[in-house]
């Protein structure tokens, strides 16, 4: 099952699949929301997400809940990339966008 509310339809879904519950309920409400299921370790996915934010105008809430668990040496590196490094890059990029549109102290 794959549910995504976005301006861009994913070309393919590869394992593991991200399940976003409630996205259709949010879409049906009066709230404007955009949810993504990108691979946070892929720069192109993160850039596409940031471009979508540019199209929408601002970020009011950012929930970054990426996380994986893999075994072995290669798995450990992927764990570090997805769980520790990528969220920092996303937060930095999104923080810059937030500061462009929302005055400090709000």
Curated annotation (Swiss-Prot):
Q: Which domain of life is it from?
A: Eukaryota
GO MF annotation terms: 3-oxoacyl-[acyl-carrier-protein] reductase (NADPH) activity
Record Pfam families:
adh_short
Enumerate the InterPro entries for this protein. Answer: NAD(P)-bd_dom_sf, SDR, SDR_fam
Query: Does the record carry NADP as a key word?
Result: yes
Cellular location of this protein?
Answer: Plastid, Chloroplast; Plastid
Q: What is its main location?
A: plastid
Assigned EC number? 1.1.1.100
Pathway it acts in? Lipid metabolism; fatty acid biosynthesis
**Which reaction(s) are listed as its catalytic activity?**
a (3R)-hydroxyacyl-[ACP] + NADP(+) = a 3-oxoacyl-[ACP] + NADPH + H(+)
GO CC terms, sorted: chloroplast
Q: In which tissues is it expressed?
A: Mesocarp.
Its BP terms in the Gene Ontology are: fatty acid biosynthetic process
The UniProt keywords, alphabetically, are: Chloroplast, Fatty acid biosynthesis, Fatty acid metabolism, Lipid biosynthesis, Lipid metabolism, NADP, Oxidoreductase, Plastid
Q: Does this UniProt record's set of keywords contain Transport?
A: no
Assembly and interaction partners? Homotetramer.
Q: Which family does it belong to?
A: Belongs to the short-chain dehydrogenases/reductases (SDR) family.
Something else the entry says is: Exhibits a marked preference for acyl-carrier protein derivatives over CoA derivatives as substrates.
What is the protein's given name?
A: 3-oxoacyl-[acyl-carrier-protein] reductase
Please tell me the species this chain comes from: Persea americana
Q: What is the lineage of its organism?
A: Eukaryota, Viridiplantae, Streptophyta, Embryophyta, Tracheophyta
């Amino acid at each position: 099952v794959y549910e995504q509310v976005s301006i861009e339809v994913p070309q393919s879904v590869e394992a593991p699949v991200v399940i976003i519950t409630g996205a259709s309920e949010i879409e049906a409400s009066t709230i404007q929301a955009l949810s993504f299921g990108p691979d946070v370790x892929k720069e192109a996915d993160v850039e596409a997400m940031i471009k979508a934010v540019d199209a929408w105008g601002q970020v009011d809430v950012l929930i970054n809940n990426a996380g994986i668990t893999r075994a072995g040496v290669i798995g450990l590196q992927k764990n570090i990339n997805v769980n520790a490094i990528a969220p920092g890059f996303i937060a930095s990029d999104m923080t810059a966008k937030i500061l462009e549109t929302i005055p400090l102290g709000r």
